[in-house]
Amino acid sequence: RLKKTRLLMQEKELEMLLVTSPHNFRYFTGFDSYFWESPTRPWFLLLSLNHDPIAIIPSIGKTALQKTWIKNINAWQSPNPNDEGITTLQDTILSIKSNKCSIGCEMGMESHLRMSINDFQKLNTNLANHSFVDASSLIWKLRMIKSKNEISKLKQIISIASNVFDQLPKHLQIDQSEIEICNIMKKKLLDLGADHTLYMSC
């Protein structure tokens, strides 16, 4: 994934890619956690053309992230409402490239920056020689083509979900609400091997 990302970065003339959203952080690091359920503190991943990936994260997550393949982790002491990682992120960017460069961010279709607007504006101001540009199309292009391993995992979870749908009528009663039915389905998904159910419409 990193190799393909760098090729796309070269095409887009990007020297760095700043990842902030949980699903893309998970995609590049393999790290999955309920830390994402709290929007209080951001987590950053910085990919560059010529350096190993660097994670910039709150100190509470360092031990867990060290179990992944990411070896460069810059952590700040958190909670720190006055500076939740922005100075650490800024210093990390400058350590890679102190002069002008283009940094891709998740700013386009179905994307978002998982940081406050004030912090992003502060980052732009403090790194005036650097430009932050939309790289969502790069990430979309990268993620649309699945590897054999990804396809295998998709087949597995689709099979689990299909089995739950098939079995669901056996566990339902006439007087149950939609919420109760959804809760039954969530439990059955977990029982059959799903990791979790983040979203279910009812």
Question: What residue spans do the PLM features occupy?
Answer:
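Flexible, acidic/His-enriched mid-domain "rim/lid" segments that flank
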Residues: 2, 81-197
